[in-house]
Amino acid sequence: MTQLFDTLGFIDTSAARTGAAAATHDAAATSTEPAGPAGAAAVSLEQVGKVFATPRGQAAALRDVTLDVRRGEVFGIIGRSGAGKSTLLRLVNGLERPSSGRVRVQGVDVGALDEDGLVALRRRTGMVFQHFNLLSAKTVFENVALPLKIAGVPKAERVRKVEALLELVGLAAKRDAYPASLSGGQKQRVGIARALVHDPEVLLCDEATSALDPETTQSILALLADINRRLGLTIVLITHEMEVIRAVCDTVAVIEQGEVVETGPVWRVFGDPRHGATRALLSTLVHDLPAELAARVQPLPEQAALPDGAQVVLDVRYTGESGGEPDVGALAAALGGSVRFLHGGIERIQGHAQGRLVIAAALRAEDAGQSTARGGAVAALLERARRHANHAEVLGYV
């Protein structure tokens, strides 16, 4: 529990300080730590590495990580279990020191801070956990008010602040309820309110929705997006779920075996993933062909012509790079008009239309008898499709 309170910035781990002396010291500590130049990144990692000692020797958890999180954005960090996501977050709030490189939060070098400086940092850096870590013997109000009480904030100010936060997270009616009577989503809302009590500049979320059902997850993500808009708060969100990234993040970084292998705007990474780890994480969102349809798709014959009445199956993808709406009508016209849509759809991510269409198109009458060897009519069909999409490939024929 001491580590939890330390993470939240509830306590000072240096010599005991109480009353007015503590308040004066905290104010001085805050005033001597610059917030960084205007326009600087809220969180910056420069060639950061982290090595842990194990019984088998040195183990690298992070390797040469360089990231910039812009002020006011929601930045998602995604990776599989053991990729190094949580280690990265612990470096940002000073629970771990980097083995190499530099971590800055609001322009302050986290690795250079002493214990007093770390306490001040954690009060400016809110933390939302996967597990709610609420005190069962205290009410919702008391759980949220606790860090303010420990920090010596006067009672009247505590009441004002906590009531405003409970209103913000939609729990005003649960003010006097105990954690045992709350749903998982309500408990996480308490955790979010508690993380905001010190008016943080950055909010760190460590798998904040992974213990929740899908409907509750969406409500918590909507709350985080609302807080980001209302308060202009920078949010760094750790997750292993691409659905979470798509729903709320502006920018995403993909971590694989301790290295950042891909980063960029969410729409770009989703529409045109460039690393195998990213494609693997996105596979849960990319729907494969239904089994009955996949069974019907036959490979193109290498030498012979297609059977009479056969149609070429094309996998057409839109990445959103053009910024406009996919002109599906123009695609159909370019393919000769005899087109069937077999599978897929278009969605919008950050205002960019992207998606996948699996279509069946007939060869032109004059080309229908040509051999498929060395391209020929099928290659011409594919080329026409590529003029109206970002990517297109032949899957076979039906």
Curated annotation (Swiss-Prot):
Part of the ABC transporter complex MetNIQ involved in methionine import. Responsible for energy coupling to the transport system. The complex is composed of two ATP-binding proteins (MetN), two transmembrane proteins (MetI) and a solute-binding protein (MetQ). ATP binds at G79, R80, S81, G82, A83, G84, K85, S86. CDD domains: ABC_MetN_methionine_transporter. The keyword Zinc does not apply. It is an enzyme of class 7 (translocase). It comes from Burkholderia lata (strain ATCC 17760 / DSM 23089 / LMG 22485 / NCIMB 9086 / R18194 / 383). PANTHER family: AMINO ACID IMPORT ATP-BINDING PROTEIN (PTHR43166), METHIONINE IMPORT ATP-BINDING PROTEIN METN (PTHR43166:SF30). Its EC number is 7.4.2.11. One of its GO terms (cellular component) is plasma membrane. Residues 43-282 form the ABC transporter domain. This is Methionine import ATP-binding protein MetN 2. It catalyses: L-methionine(out) + ATP + H2O = L-methionine(in) + ADP + phosphate + H(+); D-methionine(out) + ATP + H2O = D-methionine(in) + ADP + phosphate + H(+). Keywords: Amino-acid transport, ATP-binding, Cell inner membrane, Cell membrane, Membrane, Nucleotide-binding, Translocase, Transport. Belongs to the ABC transporter superfamily. Methionine importer (TC 3.A.1.24) family. InterPro entries: AAA+_ATPase, ABC_transporter-like_ATP-bd, ABC_transporter-like_CS, ACT-like_dom_sf, MetN_ABC, MetN_ABC_transporter-like, NIL_domain, P-loop_NTPase. It is a peripheral membrane protein. GO terms for molecular function: ABC-type D-methionine transporter activity; ATP binding; ATP hydrolysis activity. It holds the Pfam family ABC_tran. It is found in: Cell inner membrane.
